[in-house]
Amino acid sequence: MHKILLMQNLVNIHNTLLEQSRKTIRRDLMDEINWDDRLIGIKGFRGVGKTTFLIDIMNEKYVNDKSCLYVNLNNFYFTKRKIISFADEFYKTGGKTLILDQIHKYPDWATELKGCYTNFPDLKIIFSASPVLRVLEENNELKEIAKIYHLEGLSFREYLNYQTNQNFKQYTLQEILTNHINIAQEIVQAVKPLAFFNDYLKDGFYPYFLDNKSYYSETLLKHINLALEIDVTYLNQIDLQYLPKLRKLLQIIASQSPFSPNVSKISAEVQTSRATIMNYLRYMKNARIINLLFSNGNEDEIKKPDMVYMHNTNLMYAIDEGNITSKILRQTFFYNQVGYKNQIKSSDKANFLVNDIYHFNVGGKYTLPFEEGYFAAADMIEVGNANIIPLWLFGFLY
């Protein structure tokens, strides 16, 4: 009887989430997931909207479906109940889709996910996780069965669609490179992208603006600190006494990025070893707090990155607005939007080398390609020409 009541409580929470009126932005990732897979993971930065995305999945694919159940593993119930035991009961009572939020809050999650996959052949599990969780890299039992997707912050396209009630589609990099004039002309006939661009750079990447834009920076700072305290520190088994050093390193990065790191100087300033600084950089990159740029694209654990960038422009405004310049905003935006689905390396002839083929200079309205065959991503132009492409248009890649 007690188990029945607990299960009903979880069902009530599930129903309440579906019934709540809330603002949301439909993410195109919904259409990129292969829903035939039985074990699907959604990773993303703290506060990027993973829980909202899971609720959107329920609303779109499982509304009024009693064989689907959402549970948050932050619930104290799962301190005494194993996932596999719960899934067994759910499965035997007709359950078909189990949505597990915050899988990283549960110990031995990988073994139990594998057990659920093996023991319940008609059960689909969709779970969310911290971006630093090495779901496949450190769990051989999941490599062949789990499909992992990353929920990124809003693209400029998604933000623009919401603000203007449009439905602009995303384009591949190749489509933009070969047809950017026609694409840009079609968009600017409907809206003025540059009228929304600066707002996006400041407070449009994360969905917090949907609820209360006035507290955007405070909300983002809270999630940055939680990411350092939990995603970076706890999940990488770093003692909390070293958290001040992580915070100091992030402040240095935010105040100087993009920059070529002098690891010896930084290690002296943070008062830790060079090897520790390299580890911290990698951890923060995995947490989607910073981006690292390498000449060969190989993020070797012992190789110093050529350049360090903040992951997105909103983080720059939240941590150290005084460091911001137009040049920094432009380059950070380009790396963030293009790098989500394309490989970016440093270039000895331009700012970035994309997919080992395309060299890009990123700058203001008068920016030109370094030489013939190269490209320029130019700010403050609506429509480009030849190999000069509007910077804002690279926000339409996802």
Give names to the regions the model predicted.
Residues 2-16, 130, 136-246:
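Interdomain motor-coupling "hinge/lid" segment immediately C-terminal to the ATP-binding subdomain
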Residues 50-51:
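Conserved lysine of the Walker
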Residues 65-94:
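Short glycine-rich substrate-engagement loop in P-loop NTPases that contacts/grips substrate
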Residues 91-109:
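Conserved P-loop NTPase "ATPase switch" module shared by AAA+ and STAND
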Residues 99, 124-130, 150:
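Structural recognition of the conserved hydrophobic beta-strand(s) that form the central parallel beta-sheet
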Residues 208-346:
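Accessory nucleic acid-recognition modules appended to NTPase machines
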